[in-house]
Amino acid sequence: MRFSSIIAPVSLAALASAAPALNARGDSSCIPYNIAIAIETQWISTLTNFDTATATNLLAPELVDTSDSINYIAGIPLGSPTFPSAQAYIAGQGAQPPIGFTILGTDVVTCDGYIVLRWVGAVGKQIYPSQGITILKAVQKGPDATVGPTGWQLAEIHTEFNSAAWIVDIGGTCPPPSGNARLLRN
């Protein structure tokens, strides 16, 4: 009995000391939650109410935006960057009409700048809801608000959504596969 009461705490202490340290939210290298939400909000504004000054301040010059959903609709090869730079994002997104956008949830904000959100977009005829998920990657570029919210900017955007619904909503057609190509539900 005495042996196990000594071994258990010593074993736990050894495990704890071997585990990698996690950065607490208060760490200066960790993105504060409120800044992550501000970045998310500003990114959404580039879709719903585009403003060049906001986008320029928000997006790191090395930004890469990838979305096979958008690439399919736009005729860009799948697996390629949708917007390979902040300039390309501003030129492309700035030319698009605003969309409706409802956040279903901000599910993850990591210390190292990842922000994961689920959403529903509304465009055109709004026949079908187009649900999507986006992973934003923010990086610290400075100590203050000279760039991005409090020095943080977006370096990566990864978005996927129901492109079939989007295509129908913008006036295209996207019939489901027929016959044996359909998934069977039991």
Language-model segment annotations:
Residues 19-186:
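C-terminal and inter-domain tail/linker signature
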Residues 3-19:
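Cleavable N-terminal signal peptides of Sec/SRP-targeted secreted and luminal proteins
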